[in-house]
Curated annotation (Swiss-Prot):
The keyword Transferase applies. This is Deoxycytidylate 5-hydroxymethyltransferase. It catalyses: dCMP + (6R)-5,10-methylene-5,6,7,8-tetrahydrofolate + H2O = 5-hydroxymethyl-dCMP + (6S)-5,6,7,8-tetrahydrofolate. It comes from Enterobacteria phage T4 (Bacteriophage T4). It is an enzyme of class 2 (transferase). Belongs to the thymidylate synthase family. Pfam families: Thymidylat_synt.
Length: 246
């Protein structure tokens, strides 16, 4: 059975209440946020607030597939946030494709695929993204990139492959939607690759359970939460928003 976790809609409610009650947390840069500590929910929708940016999601996926640790290799214009967190050489830690496919990180995808292929009931089907040396690697050569995803565990139950995502930190608006798209891609690929290895398996993608140490909304996106609280709509452009967080 899947734990009776919260849903994305319930996460919206908790964040909406935090904003209404002005339960603010100031981050290391002095920016106001609202936050859920120890958030755990079933990721049953591809975004929480805002709207999907399919064009960027595809560009980021292509970069992940390349396994490049340099932001210049992101197809198209390099997003400002990646430029800001990169080292003086334009290098980062958080290419998630590198994290699961590179031999330098012990081929996490292949290890997980082999484990689940040999033992479908295993609790060892895990992809480890981060590493102990991240404590020092995050600020190498002027970088500011402490990987947000710790691990993703895959559990096969009742012919469904469930993903349990474990993160230290996740931005609700930009972070979640892009990370969800990546995790859905990896889950679907794992299902396909396991089925290709044995036609009798006939696995399907199950639930994605999302566990986050700090799930937060930055003040620049408070207007989205406020708009949802008033209307139930998850997105509005800032120019069309009317309210105290304009």
């Amino acid at each position: 059975m899947i734990s009776d976790s919260m849903t994305v809609e319930e996460i919206r409610l908790h964040l909406g209440l935090a904003l209404k009650e002005k339960d603010f947390v100031v981050d290391k840069t002095g920016v106001k946020t609202i936050e859920i500590i120890g958030a755990s929910f079933v990721a049953d929708e591809p975004f929480i607030f805002g709207a999907l940016n399919d064009e960027y999601i595809q560009r980021e996926l292509e970069w992940y597939k390349s396994k490049s640790l340099f932001v210049k290799d992101i197809p198209g214009e390099t997003p400002k946030i990646w430029q800001q967190v990169a080292s003086s050489k334009g290098e980062i830690n958080s290419n998630y494709g590198w994290a699961i496919w590179s031999e330098d990180n012990y081929a996490q995808y292949d290890m997980c695929l082999a484990e689940l292929g040999q033992n479908p009931d295993s609790r060892r089907g895990i992809m480890i993204y981060t590493r102990p040396s991240m404590q020092f690697d995050y600020n190498k050569d002027g970088m500011s990139d402490f990987m947000c995803t710790n691990t993703v565990q895959y559990l096969i139950r009742d012919k469904k492959i469930n993903a349990v995502v474990n993160m230290r930190s996740n931005d609700v608006v930009f972070g979640f939607r892009n990370d969800y798209a990546w995790q859905k891609y990896v889950l679907d690929k794992l299902v396909s690759d396991l089925n290709a290895g044995d036609s009798t398996r006939q696995y399907k993608a199950g639930s994605i359970i999302w566990n986050v140490g700090s799930l937060h909304v930055y003040s620049r996106h408070f207007y989205l939460v406020d708009h949802w609280w008033k209307t139930g709509e998850t997105h509005i452009s800032k120019k069309d928003y009317v309210g105290k967080y304009a």
